[in-house]
Amino acid sequence: LAFFDESKNLKDRQINNIPIFGSFSRLIKLKQQFPDLEVWLAMPSIQTEKRRAIITKLEKIKVAVRTVPSFHELITDKKTMSDIQNLSLDDLLPRTRVERDVVDDSNDKNFLISGAGGSIGSEIVRQLLDSNPCSIILFDISEFNLFRVERECQAIISSKSLSTKIVPILGDIKDSKNLNFLFQQHKVDYVYHAAAYKHVPLVEDTNNIIKACENNVLGTLNLAKVSMENDVESFVMISTDKAVRPTNVMGASKRMAEILIQSLNTHASKTNFSMVRFGNVLNSSGSVIPLFIDQIAKGGPVTLTHKEVTRYFMTIPEASNLVLQASQMADGGEVFILDMGEQVKIYDLARKLIHLSG
């Protein structure tokens, strides 16, 4: 066990007889001496650029990197010292995370999130809870996902002493009768439509094309019409950059849904319709990151379609924050996108994950 710190004041000192090293070359020697060496980063408040520079150095010597909880998390009992975690996915992106404040005017509003149990839907719910809205309707077709997100919401509400009412609803966005009853009963003000079939290879299968289009196109149209009929203030549809000149069924179905939503916005309605296009969302269900992590945990191999393939990436919190911004910024019919910087090589992403996993 050893400490590393670049501060000159700590050079050659000890803490409880444990040496403090300040030279990176010493770390390289330790790696040679102990091949299974792990490095724990105890710098939760360090600037992003400096943190990324340190991680890049550690990546080159192929050590496993973990992070320890912040001092604030420890003293507030949110975490303990046993909560050692892998690196945040933010550390994999070659840019600073994009995050903008969303105006808090939702205390008396009622929200419905379709696909609330999914990776994007559940993060939208978490960010909404920061505003302590009147109610959040968790709408999902998956019983397990709905149970999981509802339980998490109740834990957040309890820990933060919030007054938000959580309403878990099992349902299908194609069921107009059920949706109308739900909207009238709960006086829905905002709809965030995250429910979709989005796994490209699965949707591309000839056995699944019809169901994918029914859900992504007709289901979206149905939910939008019910929202309009019930005077919902804002309807934000989550789309994809694959809807631009689509080359697959998933992208084409999303583009069709976009066109339908934009056509509804031209009608005399109190509902403001808008869309948000996502790039590849890190660690969302079906994305490459969970697949890579699983392959690494099993000892490999890590599989790629091609070494030169590049993609734009965004994190789940970034994607969800963009959805909330869209509902406040939209005048009607817009398509919002996030500036995701430069494209990232999938190969580089996989290599970084492998190196930082030791």
Where are the regions that the model predicts?
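A solvent-exposed beta-alpha-beta segment
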Residues: 1-64, 141-148, 167, 171
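Flexible, Lys/Arg-rich cytosolic regulatory linkers and terminal tails that connect or flank
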Residues: 24, 51-110, 228
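NAD(P)-cofactor binding segment of oxidoreductase domains
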Residues: 52-66, 135-142, 184-185, 190, ...
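Conserved Rossmann-fold NAD(P)-dependent oxidoreductase catalytic core, especially the SDR/UDP-sugar
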Residues: 76, 193, 197-258, 263-264
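N-terminal Rossmann NAD(P)H-binding glycine-rich loop of SDR-like oxidoreductase domains
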Residues: 111-131
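Conserved Rossmann-fold cofactor-binding substructure of NAD(P)-dependent oxidoreductases
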Residues: 167-190
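Conserved beta-loop-beta element that borders a ligand/cofactor-binding pocket
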Residues: 231-234, 260-310, 334-337
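Mid/C-terminal beta-alpha module of Rossmann-like enzyme folds, strongest
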Residues: 329-358
